[in-house]
């Protein structure tokens, strides 16, 4: 049983001789030549720690311009961007080295913060189309070009493992495309066995040979007495015509409508659209035939309304004249009586 080294106290700084216990307990990737190259050559000072910044001692303030410039400068070093380019799925060890390099320059940022910061800058540069350029756009473009991130954002794909079910679209395509291949192979194997070994083929008949010759037997005329006779001693099985695998003949293991369904499946959608359009046009013709008489009836009703309006005007004028005449006659009669 391996004994883990005792964790150093939080208040005591890590010594140069002993690396941080968190790095060793996490079981990180061992130091390679690229790691040694990253820690040497201007990035590491003599006597500085090589461990990344822990979340407890990291800064929680927003990134400043100096911190962003140091982060991009660290990522643009060949050891860093080559490590990110070689292993895209496991970028955390590389960002641990970036965090350690920034810690030596008095920037306390965790590996996750460094990764999120670069992703934020990359997305912001992609979204800033037609806007004025920022102070770090050239470095971000250079880093994106080195890492191959200058194209459109990638769609994350998950590899189908042994325990992961396949998607429905892929399974249906794989079920349709390579389905006839095993049938043809199974049909070719018995034929080769019959040609190579005639006697065992007659003695032991497999189900595959029976199923392969079922279509030939059903389509051929009924057997006569000569066909039922056993073969002659000198007559071998090779003299009989061997059935050649014909792609037009349906195999017994394949459903009868599968080959026709494959040929007509691309034409199903256009036929259904044409049928729907024809039905729509037929319904529109029926509607027009129904609306024609209704239009005639509405025009007739409009004429009747006009006639009724004229007769109503005449009736009103006659009534008004009758009322005025009766009033005038009453006035004349009353005037004569008073005189």
Swiss-Prot record:
Location of Phosphoserine modifications: 15, 18, 48, 54
Disordered: annotated segments: 1-62, 144-270
Alphabetical GO biological process terms: positive regulation of transcription by RNA polymerase II
Tissue expression summary: Expressed mainly in pluripotent cells with expression rapidly down-regulated upon cell differentiation.
Top-rank taxon: Eukaryota
Keyword Transcription set for record: yes
GO MF terms, alphabetically ordered: HMG box domain binding; TBP-class protein binding; transcription coactivator activity
Any one GO CC term of the record: nucleus
Biased composition (Polar residues): 261-270
Keywords: Activator, Nucleus, Phosphoprotein, Transcription, Transcription regulation
Predominant subcellular localization, coarse grouping: nucleus
PTM comment: Phosphorylated.
Cellular compartments annotated: Nucleus
Basic residues composition-biased segments: 154-170
Low complexity bias (residue ranges): 171-193, 218-229
Free-text note on domains in this protein's UniProt record: The leucine-zipper domain is required for coactivation activity. When this domain is deleted, the protein is able to stimulate transcription from a number of gene promoters.
Function: Acts as a transcriptional coactivator of ATF2.
Protein name: Undifferentiated embryonic cell transcription factor 1
Organism annotation: Mus musculus (Mouse)
Taxonomic lineage of the native organism: Eukaryota, Metazoa, Chordata, Craniata, Vertebrata
């Amino acid at each position: 049983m391996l004994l883990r080294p005792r964790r150093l106290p939080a208040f005591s700084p890590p010594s140069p001789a002993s690396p941080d216990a968190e790095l060793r307990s996490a079981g990180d990737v061992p130091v390679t030549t690229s790691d040694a190259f990253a820690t040497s050559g201007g990035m590491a000072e003599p006597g500085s720690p090589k461990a990344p910044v822990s979340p407890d001692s990291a800064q929680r303030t927003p990134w400043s311009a100096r911190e962003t410039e140091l982060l991009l400068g660290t990522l643009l070093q060949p050891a860093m961007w080559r490590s990110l380019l070689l292993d895209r799925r496991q970028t955390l060890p590389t960002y641990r080295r970036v965090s350690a390099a920034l810690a030596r320059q008095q920037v306390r940022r965790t590996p996750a913060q460094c990764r999120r910061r670069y992703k934020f800058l990359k997305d912001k540069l992609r979204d800033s189309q037609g806007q004025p350029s920022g102070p770090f756009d050239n470095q971000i473009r250079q880093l994106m070009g080195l890492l191959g991130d200058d194209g459109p954002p990638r769609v994350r794909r998950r590899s189908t493992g042994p325990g992961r079910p396949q998607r429905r679209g892929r399974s249906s395509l794989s079920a349709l495309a390579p389905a006839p291949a095993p049938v043809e192979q199974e049909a070719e194997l018995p034929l080769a066995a019959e040609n190579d070994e005639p006697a065992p083929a007659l003695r032991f008949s497999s189900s595959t040979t029976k199923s392969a010759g079922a279509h030939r037997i059903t389509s051929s005329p009924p057997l006569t007495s000569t066909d039922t006779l056993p073969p002659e001693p000198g007559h071998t099985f090779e003299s009989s015509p061997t059935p050649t695998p014909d792609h037009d003949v349906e195999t017994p293991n394949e459903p009868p409508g599968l080959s026709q369904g494959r040929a007509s499946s691309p034409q199903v959608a256009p036929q259904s659209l044409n049928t729907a359009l024809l039905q729509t046009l037929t319904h529109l013709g029926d509607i027009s035939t129904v609306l024609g008489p209704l239009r005639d009836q509405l025009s007739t009703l409009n004429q009747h309304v006009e006639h009724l309006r004229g007769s109503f005007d005449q009736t009103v004028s006659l009534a008004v004249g009758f009322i005025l005449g009766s009033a005038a006659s009453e006035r004349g009669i009353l005037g004569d009586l008073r005189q």
